[in-house]
C-alpha cells in the first residue's frame, strides 16, 4: 500500500469479527456487529498546533487500536483492500 495520511490522520484496517459465539452459535444481523478494533497501517506526521509546531501522534504503525466508528470515519478501498481513514481523536485506546 502506497499512501501517506496527512497531519493527524491515521489509516487503519478493521479486524475480523467472530461470526460464532463461544458456544458455537452462528451470529447474524445485529449480533454480528462490525469490530471497532483495527490495525494501524499508516500515520500522518502529527497535529499542527496553534503556534505552528507539530505534535507527533501517540499511535504508530502496527498498533492495534479501539476506535469510535462514527461520524468522520472515511471508508476507502486502496489496492483492493478495505481501509478506514480517521483522525487520531477518534482512537479511544491502544491495545497492549
UniProtKB/Swiss-Prot annotation:
UniProt source species: Haemophilus influenzae (strain PittGG)
One GO biological process term: chaperone cofactor-dependent protein refolding
UniProt keywords, alphabetically: Chaperone, Cytoplasm
Any single GO CC term annotated in Swiss-Prot or TrEMBL for this entry: cytoplasm
A Pfam family of this chain: Cpn10
SUPFAM superfamilies attached to this UniProt entry: GroES-like (SSF50129)
Protein's name according to its UniProt entry: Co-chaperonin GroES
GO MF: ATP binding; metal ion binding; protein folding chaperone; protein-folding chaperone binding; unfolded protein binding
InterPro entries, per database record: Chaperonin_GroES, Chaperonin_GroES_sf, Chaprnonin_Cpn10_CS, GroES-like_sf
CDD domains reported for this sequence: cpn10
Functional summary from the UniProt entry: Together with the chaperonin GroEL, plays an essential role in assisting protein folding. The GroEL-GroES system forms a nano-cage that allows encapsulation of the non-native substrate proteins and provides a physical environment optimized to promote and accelerate protein folding. GroES binds to the apical surface of the GroEL ring, thereby capping the opening of the GroEL channel.
Gene: groES
Amino acid at each position: 500500500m502506497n499512501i501517506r495520511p496527512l497531519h493527524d490522520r491515521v489509516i487503519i484496517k478493521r479486524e475480523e469479527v467472530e461470526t460464532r459465539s463461544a458456544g458455537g452459535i452462528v451470529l447474524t444481523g445485529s449480533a454480528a456487529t462490525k469490530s471497532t478494533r483495527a490495525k494501524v497501517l499508516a500515520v500522518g506526521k502529527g497535529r499542527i498546533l496553534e503556534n505552528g509546531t507539530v505534535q507527533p501522534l501517540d499511535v504508530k504503525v502496527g498498533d492495534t487500536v479501539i476506535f469510535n466508528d462514527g461520524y468522520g470515519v472515511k471508508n476507502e478501498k486502496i489496492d483492493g483492500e478495505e481501509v478506514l481513514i480517521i483522525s487520531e481523536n477518534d482512537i479511544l485506546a491502544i491495545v497492549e
